[in-house]
């Protein structure tokens, strides 16, 4: 995968896949939406914008399968321990700047690997891992009843896993056939000890490769060797592009998510491995040729999987002008994935989980469909708040190589319980149905981005967001033209409008964003990150970012008052505020003042004093159940909660009189003191 900070739009080129203006200048601040590349002539865009993930499967000459592991006893499904990943850092990691090296070795990879080791168990090989050597000519022979492969000619000087050179102490003895003839045998040093107490060896590098310079990516990863008994990957690599490693605290969560995503590709979620999956009894789900391998698809450059793993299906797809077209999708149809997908969407007839069908080679088929699982960790771009859901854990179980600990799955709100119409039809059908009922078409949206911005909340209510519906420079493909009408848009222009993230089938949705100043990243709109707290003089809505903060809708724009001065921020609609749960219900905190939400949709009049200003505004209560495990029945708010005691206005007549009296006394005090001193003497 080629992952990046937050992105998901198409790459360069004509038509909808080309670059477009995705930036808004807001009083000197560049607002960049994740997944919106900047148009020509726009201000520079930081790594917050990137192309989709492109997981490049290594070619069949770069991947070595059927690697013999000594005493590799395999049991059926009953794994006996957590997955053990051994991390080997390349010299290029040691050459990073100290703060980047510390981030990679002490935070990013240890935390990612700790999570994955707790999440998965494996059919553990009892022996050590010794990897096969690559051949100088990429040609080799195998002998019947001999588990090793023999290079025709010579072994390669170096064996690589992706761009990283594998240490000699991890490699089997070189075995060759001179001039391609028998007898063949081992040459050179004997087998070293290899890697003990590991199920998977991960080689981590920070090499400035060609991919790093051309694809604007943070990192990429893949597997490079598979063991002989069950075809499970036993070695892989992850390469971090050195110039893209960020040490900013606000970007750590995104980078950690990227590293997890990369390692999961190397462990099993890869189109290059679909043909090697096994059932729960250890039998291959795809038939094997005489050489013990699945058939190879030369047009795809992959081993061809069977329809027990991936199946092609046609959907009836609503588009504009009341037309229905046929939309081809590929579904992953292994048993646990089907079970978890049906439960998640509440669709008992769902045939499987849809794989990505856009983004080009490396994105297609290697990820979940972005339209259906927007912020799931294994979708093809990082737009916001990645979570590793039960569906991905189910896929890893269905490889036949792992058992998943589902208590480690993270909650995925996107698409949850929305039914078959959501998961099997186009987003146009969903949006139109909700428009007819005068309902918000969540998780999609149909509000055009404008200046000033109309802010809303991300679907999980953890970040401020905007609808990413926009105009493209060219008409979208007819299959992705969804709108029969948009306020203020002429009918002839409607084919140009869609969501900014191509791999979400151009479906528009509310998306978090980040602020940039002179091209430099300032902060994101994620409510939970303390470093996103706005400066006091820019905090119009009296917002509070931090671990206990959520996004709340604003009924009206907040106004800052100081004597005769009044200021308001043109971009409004939502903000970040702390909430807490109580026996009385959900409490919203604005600075140190709490407001009780008695029911969803209740208007909270806010008037607080902060930094010498009075902040006036109205917030809308969410449902208590959105954030609390126990909630009282909803009631109308008491009168006392509707009209709260207002803070003292320091510029009112009464307060001005008090101030004037104190000033008068202050001026009179020296005169009075002087008079008393004179009398005393």
Swiss-Prot record:
GO terms for cellular component: cytosol; focal adhesion; lipid droplet; membrane. Metalloprotease. This is Leishmanolysin-like peptidase. Keywords: Cell cycle, Cell division, Cytoplasm, Hydrolase, Lipid droplet, Metal-binding, Metalloprotease, Mitosis, Protease, Zinc. InterPro entries: Peptidase_M8. It comes from the Eukaryota. Binds 1 zinc ion per subunit. The active site is at 262. The gene is Lmln. GO terms for molecular function: metal ion binding; metalloendopeptidase activity. It is an enzyme of class 3 (hydrolase). Belongs to the peptidase M8 family. Signal peptide: none annotated. Gene3D superfamilies: 3.10.170.20, Leishmanolysin , domain 2, Leishmanolysin domain 3. The lineage of its organism: Eukaryota, Metazoa, Chordata, Craniata, Vertebrata.
């Amino acid at each position: 995968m080629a992952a990046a900070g937050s992105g998901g739009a198409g790459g360069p080129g004509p038509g909808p896949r080309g670059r477009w203006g995705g930036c808004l200048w807001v009083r000197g601040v560049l607002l960049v939406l994740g997944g919106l590349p900047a148009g020509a002539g726009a201000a520079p865009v930081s790594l917050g914008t990137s192309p989709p993930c492109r997981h490049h499967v290594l070619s069949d000459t770069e991947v070595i399968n059927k690697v013999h592991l000594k005493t590799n006893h395999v049991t059926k499904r009953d794994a006996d321990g957590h997955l053990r990943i051994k991390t080997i850092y390349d010299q290029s990691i040691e050459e990073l700047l100290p703060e980047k090296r510390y981030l990679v070795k002490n935070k990013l990879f240890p935390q990612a690997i700790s999570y994955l080791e707790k999440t998965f168990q494996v059919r553990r090989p009892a022996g050590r891992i010794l990897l096969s050597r690559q051949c100088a000519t990429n040609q080799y022979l195998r002998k019947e009843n001999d588990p090793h492969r023999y290079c025709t000619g010579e072994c390669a000087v170096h064996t690589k896993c992706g761009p990283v050179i594998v240490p000699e102490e991890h490699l089997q003895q070189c075995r060759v056939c001179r001039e391609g003839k028998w007898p063949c045998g081992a040459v050179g040093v004997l087998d070293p000890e290899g890697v003990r107490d590991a199920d998977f060896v991960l080689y981590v590098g920070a090499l400035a490769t060609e991919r790093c310079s051309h694809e604007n990516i943070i990192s990429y990863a893949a597997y490079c060797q598979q063991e002989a008994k069950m075809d499970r990957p036993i070695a892989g690599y992850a390469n971090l592009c050195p110039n893209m490693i960020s040490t900013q605290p606000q970007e750590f969560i995104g980078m950690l998510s990227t590293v997890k995503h990369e390692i999961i590709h190397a462990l099993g979620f890869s189109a290059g491995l679909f043909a090697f999956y096994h059932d729960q009894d250890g039998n291959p789900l795809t038939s094997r040729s005489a050489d013990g391998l699945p058939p190879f698809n030369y047009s795809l450059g992959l081993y061809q999987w069977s329809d027990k793993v991936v199946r092609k299906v046609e959907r009836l797809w609503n588009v504009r002008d009341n037309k229905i077209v046929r939309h081809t999708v590929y579904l992953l149809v292994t048993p646990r994935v089907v079970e978890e997908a049906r439960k998640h969407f509440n669709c008992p007839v769902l045939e499987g989980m849809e794989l990505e069908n856009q983004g080009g080679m490396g994105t297609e088929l290697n990820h979940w469909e972005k339209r259906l699982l927007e912020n799931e960790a294994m979708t093809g771009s990082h737009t916001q708040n990645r979570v590793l859901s039960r569906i991905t854990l189910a896929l890893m179980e269905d490889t036949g190589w792992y058992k998943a600990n589902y208590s480690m799955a993270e909650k995925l709100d996107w698409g949850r319980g929305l039914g078959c119409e959501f998961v099997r039809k186009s987003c146009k059908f969903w949006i139109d149905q909700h428009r007819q009922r005068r309902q918000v078409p969540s998780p999609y949206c149909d509000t055009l981005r404008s200046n000033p911005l109309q802010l809303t909340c991300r679907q999980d209510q953890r970040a401020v967001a905007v609808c990413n519906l926009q105009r493209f420079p060219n008409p979208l493909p007819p299959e992705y033209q969804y709108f029969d009408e948009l306020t203020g848009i002429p009918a002839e222009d409607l084919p140009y409008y869609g969501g900014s993230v191509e791999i979400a089938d151009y479906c528009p949705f509310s998306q978090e964003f980040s602020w940039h100043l002179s091209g430099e990243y300032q902060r994101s709109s994620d409510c939970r990150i303390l470093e996103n707290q706005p400066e006091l003089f820019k905090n119009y809505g009296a917002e509070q970012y931090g671990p206990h903060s959520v996004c709340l809708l604003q009924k009206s724009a907040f106004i800052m008052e100081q004597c005769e001065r009044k200021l308001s921020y043109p971009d409004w609609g939502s903000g970040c505020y702390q909430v807490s749960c109580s026996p009385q219900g959900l409490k919203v905190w604005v600075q140190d003042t709490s407001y009780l939400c008695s029911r969803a949709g209740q208007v909270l009049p806010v008037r607080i004093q902060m930094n010498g200003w009075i902040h006036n505004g109205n917030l809308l209560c969410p449902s208590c159940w959105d954030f609390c495990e126990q909630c009282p029945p909803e009631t109308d708010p008491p009168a006392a909660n509707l009209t709260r005691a207002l803070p003292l206005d320091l510029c009112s007549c009464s307060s001005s009189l008090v101030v004037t009296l104190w000033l008068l006394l202050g001026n009179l005090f020296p005169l009075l003191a002087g008079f008393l001193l004179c009398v005393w003497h």
